[in-house]
Amino acid sequence: MSKLKVCLRHISEVFLYEYYCLGDDEYEISDEDTLTPHKEKAKEQLLAGNYSGAQQEWLSAHLENPVDMETILGIILCCKQLGDADGEYSYSTESYNYCCTRAELAAYYRNLGWYYLEKYKPEVSAACYLYSKYFGESQQADAELEFLEKAVGKKVAKKDLPQIQKILKDNQIPTEANPVTLALLYKAAEEAAEGRDKDQALDCYRMVYDLTADKEIGKRIESLESR
């Protein structure tokens, strides 16, 4: 049986791919960069306003690297522009496993906010947008909240963090980074450090620290940086 060929360029991608995507298949990493050309074409199509064409290129990129967040976010953007709410939700929920920074988690909650507004669930939508702001202030989230208020004809009620988290949990929406993903990033960091790949080890530790602010991880980063 032929091996799958994928374009993975970072140890974090290898760990995420092997855990979330590989299954029982075998794979090999392509020698050439088969991902970037599709991403560049997708961006060209976006600039031309061809969302269907852009989506096809993003989907081709997704086949080359299923864990690349820029690609998944590109697909989600096209789903929104093409009015495909169910597709947007499917890729948004998939993206949760690959959120490695606070900015990516913020995007995850904003994308869920869009979906729940499309499905006429304004309270859940508002909770998602409000929660996204805890991971990073965003003009986009503010604009979407303004749009939501106009759509329902009233102001979004102020809620504290526990109230927002309760709404999310009641709708089976996670309220923190995926602990499995954090563990995978930590393992990737350790393996990179053992292999004397300081830069990739630092990348992985910094992603974990960004999501957790764990003091022990902070010390490891300082130790590596001083070498």
For the regions a language model picked out, list residue spans one by one.
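Register position in tetratricopeptide repeats
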Residues: L47-A48, Q81, E118-K119, K150-A151, ...
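Start-of-helix register in tetratricopeptide repeats
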Residues: T36, E70, E104-A107, Q140, ...
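Short coil turns that delineate tetratricopeptide repeat
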Residues: P66, C100-A103, G136-E137, P179, ...
